[in-house]
Amino acid sequence: GIGSVQNYMYSNVVFGGLKVPHNDYVQMSCDSGIIGVVLYLLAVFVIIVHSFVVYQKYTDVSIKMCAIVAGSSMAGVALTMYTDNVVNYSMATLSYPFGFYGMMLGLIKGEK
């Protein structure tokens, strides 16, 4: 990995050693620079828009369900990253949008 979290994983401090701002975008900016933040936000935006386009285009209930859950949960995670440390503490929550997005893409591929 990169940045302060990876450094923390290799340190000997067991509790209370991780001090990061409660904003994942600030942390990503420090770890990956502005290019990393812009690329991440671009990927988030593309997933949200594509999910809602798929929701409008397809009639299959499973595809629509995966699309709306992927798009809305991605938007929720992106907003939560502004006020909390989603990347550091909630990796399970961070993976839900990508899981539903992958299921949506698989269902679309299976329909063709």
Model-predicted segments: where are they?
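Extended hydrophobic-aromatic, low-complexity segments
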Residues: 1, 37-39, 112
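Long extracytoplasmic/lumenal interhelical loops at the membrane interface
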Residues: 1-32
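Generic hydrophobic alpha-helical membrane-span motif
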Residues: 7-9, 39-42, 90
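N-terminal low-complexity, intrinsically disordered patches enriched in charged
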Residues: 10-12, 42-45, 111
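Short, structured secondary-structure boundary patches
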Residues: 17-20, 42-43, 58-62, 100-104
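Generic recognition of well-ordered alpha-helical segments
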Residues: 24, 28-34, 47, 74-78, ...
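Hydrophobic transmembrane alpha-helices and their immediate junctions
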Residues: 32-75
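Transmembrane alpha-helices of multi-pass inner-membrane enzymes
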Residues: 67-112
